[in-house]
């Protein structure tokens, strides 16, 4: 079993009240890496009845992505991620790990404040400043080595939550 082990700064004997709150609002989505986006959308639709509520290509990250929802599509989503180019993070993930769960994402009101709160706890984030995510959102990621092996994404929606 993987032990959740933050950096040494996060292990100091301090209480959580010493740090600013991260203020997670909800589970936003679970990301699944797939080699073929269209085939994966069809599989999730035919097998589980999920419907595609958003689809785009993020050139900056080199990924084709689709958000799949249940019912009216307003709850937690499944995000399918397929490489748009061979040097993308998703292509490297697929080469290393094969298809499957790639990330867990939380909605936050302010991605920079959440990142600062996590850094204050000694956790590393992948980006110094937020990047553009799905639908114009702003995102950052907690390094998986600081989150029990899970790539945690922080998502600030493009519109007010």
Question: What residue spans do the PLM features occupy?
Answer:
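Short, conserved turn/kink motifs that form compact alpha/beta structural patches or helix kinks used as
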Residues: 81-83
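An N-terminus-focused feature that recognizes amino-terminal "leader" regions
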Residues: 47, 62-65
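Amphipathic alpha-helical segments
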Residues: 36-51, 119-121
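A cross-kingdom feature marking solvent-exposed beta-strand/loop segments within repeated
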Residues: 17-22, 26-28, 52-53, 60-62, ...
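Extended macromolecule-engaging scaffold surfaces
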Residues: 2, 50-53
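Short loop/beta submotifs within extracellular cysteine-rich repeat domains
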Residues: 51, 74-77, 88-89, 149-150
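Vicinal oxygen chelate
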Residues: 2-22, 27-35, 66-72, 76-78, 90-117, ...
């Amino acid at each position: 079993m993987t032990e959740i082990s933050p950096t040494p700064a996060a292990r100091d004997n301090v209480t959580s009240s010493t740090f600013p709150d991260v203020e997670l609002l909800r589970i936003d989505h679970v990301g699944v890496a797939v080699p073929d986006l269209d085939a994966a959308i069809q599989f999730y639709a035919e097998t589980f009845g999920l419907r595609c509520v958003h689809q785009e290509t993020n050139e900056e990250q080199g990924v084709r992505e689709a958000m799949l929802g249940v019912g009216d599509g307003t709850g937690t989503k499944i995000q399918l991620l397929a490489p748009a180019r061979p040097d993308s993070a998703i292509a490297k993930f697929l080469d290393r790990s094969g298809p499957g769960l790639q990330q867990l994402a939380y909605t936050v009101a302010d991605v920079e404040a959440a990142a600062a709160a996590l850094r204050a706890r000694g956790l590393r984030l992948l980006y110094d400043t937020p990047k553009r995510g799905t639908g114009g959102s702003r995102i950052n990621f907690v390094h998986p080595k600081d989150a029990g092996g899970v790539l945690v994404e922080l998502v600030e929606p493009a519109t007010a939550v």
